[in-house]
Curated annotation (Swiss-Prot):
Gene Ontology cellular component annotations, sorted alphabetically: cytosol
The protein's role, per its UniProt record: Attaches a formyl group to the free amino group of methionyl-tRNA(fMet). The formyl group appears to play a dual role in the initiator identity of N-formylmethionyl-tRNA by promoting its recognition by IF2 and preventing the misappropriation of this tRNA by the elongation apparatus.
Pfam families according to UniProt: Formyl_trans_C, Formyl_trans_N
Swiss-Prot/TrEMBL keywords: Protein biosynthesis, Transferase
Family per similarity comment: Belongs to the Fmt family.
Stretch forming the signal peptide: none
Positions of (6S)-5,6,7,8-tetrahydrofolate binding: S110, L111, L112, P113
Gene (name only): fmt
Protein known as: Methionyl-tRNA formyltransferase
UniProt source species: Prochlorococcus marinus subsp. pastoris (strain CCMP1986 / NIES-2087 / MED4)
Length: 328
């Protein structure tokens, strides 16, 4: 089938790569315009554009798409069967969605209608979901409201973070796109609606995955150890706190139970109830910090101006003091 691919970040590249290697014809790629790097004003292409250019696929980077008559004319002239969309970065208007013969299809990284919106992977980890997945839906004007053609679930492991789960869902999206396109192709002469499921058919709670903002990245030590652990994984590697007025990105922690502290004979301050307090500095183990519930052990972090460091290195860099607070 003749396909126009819409995508921008690294997350989208695997699907483009798999489709390029298939029997389908990728007639063009639409991606976000080059962005200026924060330093040096050098323009940086999107990962999707880099891959498409390497593979000699025509690339379009429109600044605007809504009411862009010239661009819409180009899309019509390309006469494609499908638009395949994954993390393009802008909402497509109906005038564009309806151009392909067999409509426009999107891979969404959640089990719809749970986590419609911009940050489904982050929110699935933040909320402690045990499963997630990918659904291929026919696009419509509403935000992630389309009917679902194919879907597959995967388990969210306890140690999954944004990086690992994103990789799993990117791979899964590429797999499901092939299956969905095959279903569409095999049913070209039938009513595709017979294969689609309404999102309400799944009997799931509707939730919205709003965009992550700067405040979301700040660790609140008055939260439970479990909530802090989820935040660090969900917003990897950018969840942060401050110590001695310096920013510290927390990369990896371990929740310590009372049993484990007693079993390993860790020497810590006892009868301490203030969250965010350093209660233990243990050589070859690390810094132990209080939360609303269990204490946590700091395994990896990045102090501003430094590289990611582990336990003993962090003790040397931070020069921490038992009884002092993070975020003070």
């Amino acid at each position: 089938m003749r396909i126009i691919f819409w995508g921008t970040p690294e997350y989208s590249v695997k699907s483009l790569e798999v489709l390029k290697k298939s029997d389908h014809d990728i007639v063009a790629v639409i991606t976000q315009p080059d962005k200026k790097r924060s330093r040096g004003n050098k323009l940086i292409s999107s990962p999707v554009k880099e891959y498409a250019t390497k593979e000699n696929i025509p690339v379009f980077t429109p600044e605007t798409i809504k009411e862009n008559i010239q661009f819409i004319s180009i899309l019509n002239d390309l006469s494609c069967d499908l638009f395949i969309v994954i993390a393009y970065g802008k909402i497509l208007p109906k005038a564009i969605l309806d151009i392909p013969k067999y409509k426009s299809w999107n891979a969404h990284a959640s089990l719809l209608p749970r986590w419609r919106g911009a940050a489904p992977i982050q929110w699935s980890i933040l909320e402690g979901d045990k499963i997630t997945g990918v659904g291929i839906m026919r696009m419509e004007e509403g935000l992630d409201t389309g009917d679902v053609l194919v879907e597959k679930q995967i388990k969210i492991e306890n140690n999954d973070n944004l990086k690992t789960l994103t990789k799993k869902l990117s791979d899964l999206s590429s797999e499901l796109f092939l299956r969905a396109i095959s279903d569409i192709e095999q049913n070209k002469n039938r009513d595709i609606n017979l294969l689609l499921k309404k999102q309400t058919d799944f009997k799931r709670e509707l939730k919205y995955a709003r965009m992550i903002n700067k405040l979301d990245y700040i660790i609140n030590w008055e939260n439970s150890a479990t909530d802090i652990y989820r935040k660090i994984n969900a917003l990897y590697p950018r969840a942060n706190t401050t110590y001695k007025r310096k920013n510290l990105k927390i990369i990896k922690i371990k929740i310590l139970t009372t049993h484990e502290i007693h079993n390993k004979n860790y020497k810590i301050l006892s009868n301490v109830f203030k969250p965010g307090l350093i209660i233990g500095l243990i050589k070859n183990v690390g810094i132990i910090i209080t939360t609303k519930t269990d204490p946590i052990l700091l395994l990896e972090a990045k102090l501003e101006g430094k590289k990611v460091s582990s336990q003993n290195q962090l003790i040397q860099q931070l020069n921490p003091v038992i009884g002092e607070n993070f975020s003070d």
